[in-house]
A protein has these predicted regions:
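Cytosolic, long alpha-helical scaffolding segments
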Residues: 1-258
Length: 258
């Protein structure tokens, strides 16, 4: 009976393939890979579900950037940077595939509401791709600092961490809003408040950086990497708030005053 058991195991293994890794899943579309559905409304809903997933993947990309910033092992640094590059390529492809799908839906007969939905989602896809671009730009700046053996002071590291926290809060909020069926005034306000915090903190750090460089607290080469990271984070905040504004501007989303 042992031979039969072994044969059974082989058959089951073939019939039930192993669960793909998270990284393998990242390369596949989940909701629109099978093509358009029976109605434009359902197809647009599927595209929006894909956009929610797109947002969540971009959020994970930012998490990888934060890991890269703290990585000190050379081999691990190279591996993490390669993963971020992979995420960037996936992001570019997702933008094109979602936009192409929405454009095909737009070729059919649509209500005015469906037309507005497509326009809104196309705008959102473009902004999320810009968020991913900012993540990649941050990774490249970190790589430049790594190659130049740039060392930051404890204060600079703390400031970068605070800025990362603000941007991460903003991107988490963006994903939350995209998932929600109703847009709350409180969610819009929270996004705008985070954007204001990011802008104000950027301005504060730029001013302090000039003082610190003049006081020789760190070399100018370090300040360039430092400020490039801060400015890129602020740009990311702009793209994130643009996503929320696209939803708020749309007549399709019911806005509750909460």
């Amino acid at each position: 009976m042992i031979w039969f058991t072994n044969l059974y195991v082989k058959i089951v293994t073939k019939l039930i393939p192993s669960k793909p890794s998270e990284e393998e899943n990242e390369t596949h579309l989940k909701f629109i890979s099978t093509g358009m559905l029976s109605t434009a409304e359902l197809s647009i809903l599927q595209a929006h579900n894909e956009i929610v997933l797109y947002s969540q993947r971009t959020q994970r990309m930012l998490g990888l950037v934060r890991e890269l910033y703290h990585e000190t092992d050379e081999a691990a640094f190279v591996k993490k940077f390669s993963r971020i590059q992979k995420y960037e390529n996936i992001s570019d492809r997702m933008e094109v595939e979602i936009a192409t799908y929405l454009t095909k839906v737009a070729d059919g007969r649509l209500s005015n509401e469906s037309k507005h939905q497509i326009q809104m989602n196309l705008r959102i896809v473009s902004e999320i791709e810009s968020v991913a671009d900012s993540c990649y730009n941050l990774a490249r700046t970190i790589q430049r600092g790594h190659e130049g053996k740039v060392k930051f002071t404890d204060d600079v590291n703390a400031n970068i961490e605070l800025m990362f926290n603000l941007v991460e809060s903003a991107i988490v909020q963006m994903s939350h809003i995209l998932e929600a069926s109703t847009l709350q005034i409180s969610d819009i306000n929270k996004t705008q408040n985070l954007e204001n915090e990011i802008n104000n903190f950027r301005n504060q750090l730029k001013t302090q950086n000039i003082v610190d460089v003049n006081d020789a607290k760190y070399p100018y080469s370090s300040s360039v990497i430092y400020m490039d990271m801060i400015v890129e984070c602020e740009k990311m905040g702009d793209y994130i708030v643009n996503v929320v504004e696209a939803l708020a501007d749309s007549k399709l989303y019911k806005v509750n005053a909460k």
